[in-house]
Amino acid sequence: MSWQRPDGRTAAQLRPISFQRHFTRYAPGSVLVKFGDTHVLCTASVAEEVPPFLQNTGQGWLTAEYRMLPTATQQRQPRETLKVSGRTAEIQRLIGRSLRAALDFHKLGSRTITVDADVLQADGSTRTAAITGGYVALHDAITWLYKQGLLDPAQGSPLRQQVAALSVGIVRGEVLVDLCYEEDSQAEVDMNIVMNEQGALIEIQGTAEAGCFDRSQLLQMLDMAQAGIQELLRAQRETLNL
């Protein structure tokens, strides 16, 4: 029996996507991103310092942190206080790697941008929402640096490319994009794809949760993810008035 998507979407259809910029008052960049019922608050802050391994190089850095509100899921999850879980550490490293691909660190200068992704409500695909919304917050933080006179327009923008991410998987033999939690929990294959606007791959995370998948299915997942990511990139440009 084929899988019927809980919200009635077609296999290649994204959930409703929205970005609410300047969501908080103090962060140079902030956005509330919604992928359907997955809501993530992404903020980007700036510190005029770099990690020890970059001191005296003139290069900047970007790092990311990821957390979930205890009541982001149906059952309350304890806060991660003294030590983050392996899942959290993996996700925040993914977010950091993905967004670092968007930057030219020589043009950023000797400063660090921290992107915080806080999941307010989770219905699957939180990490891909965090990356996609994190780029919007990062873009606004770079704009803030220009307004503060901390970046020289003559040097060119530190932003070298757009970045967005999308989940894709196989549920009951069918390839689907932008999985909700119910679909993710039933998936035989679960993947997260990160790309830029040229369609170049930044990261692929893929796991066969049950059984395996073949090359043709992999290529189909990549093709459907690329089409969906192009929609996300267009949505980013629209919200940023680019």
From Swiss-Prot:
Pfam families: RNase_PH, RNase_PH_C. This is Ribonuclease PH. Transmembrane segments: none annotated. NCBIfam families: RNasePH. One of its GO terms (biological process) is rRNA catabolic process. Phosphorolytic 3'-5' exoribonuclease that plays an important role in tRNA 3'-end maturation. Removes nucleotide residues following the 3'-CCA terminus of tRNAs; can also add nucleotides to the ends of RNA molecules by using nucleoside diphosphates as substrates, but this may not be physiologically important. Probably plays a role in initiation of 16S rRNA degradation (leading to ribosome degradation) during starvation. PROSITE patterns: RIBONUCLEASE_PH. The lineage of its organism: Bacteria, Bacillati, Cyanobacteriota, Cyanophyceae, Synechococcales. One of its GO terms (molecular function) is tRNA nucleotidyltransferase activity. Gene3D superfamilies: GHMP Kinase, N-terminal domain. Its EC number is 2.7.7.56. InterPro entries: ExoRNase_PH_dom1, ExoRNase_PH_dom2, ExoRNase_PH_dom2_sf, PNPase/RNase_PH_dom_sf, Ribosomal_Su5_D2-typ_SF, RNase_PH, RNase_PH_bac-type, RNase_PH_CS. Keywords: Nucleotidyltransferase, RNA-binding, rRNA processing, Transferase, tRNA processing, tRNA-binding. It catalyses: tRNA(n+1) + phosphate = tRNA(n) + a ribonucleoside 5'-diphosphate. It comes from the Bacteria. Signal peptide: none annotated. Homohexameric ring arranged as a trimer of dimers. The keyword Coiled coil does not apply. Phosphate binds at R87, S125, T126, R127. Belongs to the RNase PH family. HAMAP family: RNase_PH (MF_00564).
